[in-house]
Swiss-Prot record:
Protein name: Anamorsin homolog
Cofactor requirement: [2Fe-2S] cluster; [4Fe-4S] cluster
UniProt: [4Fe-4S] cluster binding residues: C209, C212, C220, C223
This protein's encoding gene: CIAPIN1
GO molecular function: 2 iron, 2 sulfur cluster binding; 4 iron, 4 sulfur cluster binding; electron transfer activity; metal ion binding
GO BP annotation list: iron-sulfur cluster assembly
Species assigned in the record: Drosophila ananassae (Fruit fly)
Region feature (N-terminal SAM-like domain): 4-129
Length: 248
């Protein structure tokens, strides 16, 4: 019991009341602190707070279902001392280890001693290997801090900003003369053909009433010059392209 010297608070769990005072006094003399008593059969009904004792001494330690509770009752690094146990020491030590105790051993006086870890049950600690290297993270950056950005204004010249002439975009316009190619696909062939038909229709337009030049008041309902101002007799008048075409 000398190994428990200096422990301030002890719980003594007893089974036999004979000479109980002597056994308790022995523990008190060895530790030099306070000793509380609890019957082994009343342990499951007790309501001790967590981390209440520095040492727990048990007689006849067949308490398989209560080792976890004893672990909670001990303070961090608290001691568990089993005396007068029944059965193989190896099996009992295995049960104590599985309950969360560490440094489990058999003493020379046919007793078993175990220790609670130096931290409270359910506590957490930061792990050093979880730190991330900032330089390693920068390797995967798409843009570095020293990369220069291109000025958007330098990408286009003044000539690029000028809108092109739609007529100059045609393939046929490269000849310098408004003449459609053999396999024209830019629409110039259709445009020239339309102008040709409009011109022919205008030249062949003849007045059936002879009053077309006088104005709309003297023109018939189908006059091609309807809507145009009056003109001199014999004067050539250019009609619009859509006047001689069907509306359908």
């Amino acid at each position: 019991m000398e190994q428990f010297k200096g422990l301030q608070k002890t719980l003594y769990i007893w089974t036999d009341s004979a000479d109980l005072d002597k056994r308790v006094e022995k523990v008190k003399s060895a530790t030099g602190g306070e000793v509380a008593l609890e019957n082994v059969h009343r342990l499951s009904f007790s309501s001790y707070a967590n981390s209440s004792f520095d040492l727990i001494v048990i007689e006849c330690a067949q308490l398989t279902d209560n080792y976890v509770k004893l672990l909670h009752m001990l303070k961090p690094s608290g001691k568990l001392h089993l005396v007068a146990f029944i059965g193989p020491a190896g099996s009992l030590l295995q049960e104590v280890k599985l309950s969360g105790f560490i440094n489990c051993r058999e003493d020379a006086d046919d007793a078993l001693t175990a220790e609670k870890p130096g931290y409270e049950t359910g506590s957490s600690a930061r792990l050093s290997f979880a730190k991330k290297d900032a330089s390693a993270l920068n390797v995967w950056k798409i843009s570095g801090d020293d990369e220069e950005l291109i000025d958007e204004e330098d990408l286009l010249d003044e000539e690029d900003k000028q809108k092109p002439d739609p007529a100059g975009l045609r393939v046929c316009s490269t000849t310098g003369k408004r003449k459609a190619c053999k396999n024209c696909s830019c629409g110039l062939a259709e445009e020239l053909e339309s102008e040709k038909q409009s011109k022919a229709a205008t030249e062949n337009a003849k007045s059936s009433c002879g009053n077309c030049y006088l104005g709309d008041a003297f023109r018939c309902s189908t006059c091609p010059y309807l809507g145009m101002p009056a003109f001199k007799p014999g004067e050539k008048v250019q009609l619009a392209d859509n006047l001689l075409k069907s509306d359908i």
